[in-house]
Amino acid sequence: MKLVFFTLLISVFSLSVYAEPRVIQSPDHKVNILELYTSQGCSSCPPAEQWLNSLKTEEGLWTTFVPINFHVDYWDYIGWKDPFASASFSKRQRLYKHLKFARNVATPGFILNGKGWNGWFYGQSPSWVNESPSGDILATLNGQSIEVAFTPKPQGREHLQSGALKVHIAILGFDITTKVTGGENEGRDLSHDFVGSTLFQREYYFINRIINRLLCQRKQKGKTEKKSREKDRQS
């Protein structure tokens, strides 16, 4: 899971379409990944999403931390089908519990740097870590394709050499409003930011340096921007 989580640092890269190729280098520190698992069919979720939305104005956005809003599909049967829900996002949340990095599968549910985080429920702010990365990521954007190169740092080689790396690239939606006409949030206008609308992932085995090409297709829901993207109830 450490390897999978590490590669989420690709999320700091912009995937907008440029006329000329653009090269983007990962920073010299790990970027914190804050995942929210939510659903438009969950009456307890809007406050958590409102808080996540407020991070748009936080200092360090994209350089210190990256929020991602994953809508799960396991509440789609209770009166409202979430248009942003994906079975792959539900599977991703269940994987955290299966690997014992989270205690349960619930909405709203937070994962911070690969582990369950309940601080929001107690009015706490996340504690961003400031650590050296295991390697450098170089992304070259050319039209709708992206070439990703990873070079491990000396201190990162030991635990990376024996396994596979997964590259995760998500397209996030912003300034999205949905009028809900059924389910627990019936009659409410829900606002969303950092919404994971598409998640690409590829797995590669690595010897010393990785270079791979990925095709990223634009998917527009509301005003979108390109950045990097299981049934218990907590409500």
Residue ranges and their predicted role:
Residues 14-19, 231:
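Intrinsically disordered, low-complexity serine/threonine-rich segments
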Residues 83-109, 115-235:
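Short, conserved sequence motifs used for protein processing/export or organelle targeting and
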Residues 18-106:
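Active-site-proximal cofactor/substrate-binding loop regions of enzyme domains
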Residues 71, 113-114:
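G-domain G4 guanine-recognition motif of GTPases
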Residues 5-14:
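Bacterial N-terminal signal peptides
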